[in-house]
């Protein structure tokens, strides 16, 4: 199949298996959820009644005071007491096979092509690391919410994009399922397309 180049004459020939496969919603959902879960810190921690600092002595005798019976100042009912079912640090990561991960990326890329959300260009760069230059370039292309993917890390482009809302710059080796579906449009250079194709082959 062929992808039309926006800034040059002609088209780029690409693999049908990478950019023309059916959309597998269940697979994409599973991989996206797993990827997002892997980004969780999982470091939150609370103390149970066994871990809270304080005396183990019964606050007052069982009967005769007129007050409600109480056996510990560490009770979850009490202020500064322990937490019932306290949260503990945990690993939220989920296992995703390489074949599944690659399949999800291919599925997403194919859907981007079908929805005309993937824009292929010969090259994409700015002369200097100036936000103003990139903002004007995107305005000329009628792009706002966009992920820019280049073959190699372009420092000028990266620095220029840092202060732009809903604009991100990645090199082909660091694309991920969440980023690809998070933006309205994805701009990829021809070299990046070839690199992604080789990576997912």
Swiss-Prot record:
One of its GO terms (biological process) is translation. GO terms for cellular component: ribonucleoprotein complex; ribosome. Keywords: Ribonucleoprotein, Ribosomal protein, RNA-binding, rRNA-binding. One of its GO terms (molecular function) is structural constituent of ribosome. Residues 44-71 are annotated as: Disordered. It holds the Pfam family Ribosomal_L4. It comes from the Bacteria. The keyword Transmembrane does not apply. Belongs to the universal ribosomal protein uL4 family. One of the primary rRNA binding proteins, this protein initially binds near the 5'-end of the 23S rRNA. It is important during the early stages of 50S assembly. It makes multiple contacts with different domains of the 23S rRNA in the assembled 50S subunit and ribosome. Forms part of the polypeptide exit tunnel. Part of the 50S ribosomal subunit. This is Large ribosomal subunit protein uL4. The gene is rplD.
């Amino acid at each position: 199949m062929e992808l039309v180049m926006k800034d040059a004459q002609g088209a780029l020939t690409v693999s049908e298996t990478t950019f023309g496969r059916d959309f597998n919603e269940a697979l994409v959902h599973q991989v996206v959820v797993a990827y997002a879960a892997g980004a969780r810190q999982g470091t939150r921690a609370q103390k149970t009644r066994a871990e809270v600092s304080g005396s183990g002595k019964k606050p007052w005798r069982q009967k005769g005071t007129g007050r409600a019976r109480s056996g510990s100042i560490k009770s979850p009912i009490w202020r500064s007491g322990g937490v019932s079912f306290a949260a503990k640090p945990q690993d939220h990561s989920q296992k995703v096979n390489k074949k599944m991960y690659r399949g999800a990326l291919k599925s997403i890329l194919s859907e981007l092509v079908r929805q005309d959300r993937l824009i292929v260009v010969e090259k994409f760069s700015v002369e200097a690391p100036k936000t103003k230059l990139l903002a004007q370039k995107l305005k000329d292309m009628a792009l706002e919410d966009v992920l820019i993917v280049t073959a190699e890390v372009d420092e000028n482009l990266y620095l220029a994009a840092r202060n732009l809302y809903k604009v991100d710059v990645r090199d082909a080796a660091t694309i991920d399922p969440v980023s690809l579906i998070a933006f309205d449009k994805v701009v990829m250079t021809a070299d990046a397309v070839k690199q992604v194709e080789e990576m997912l082959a």
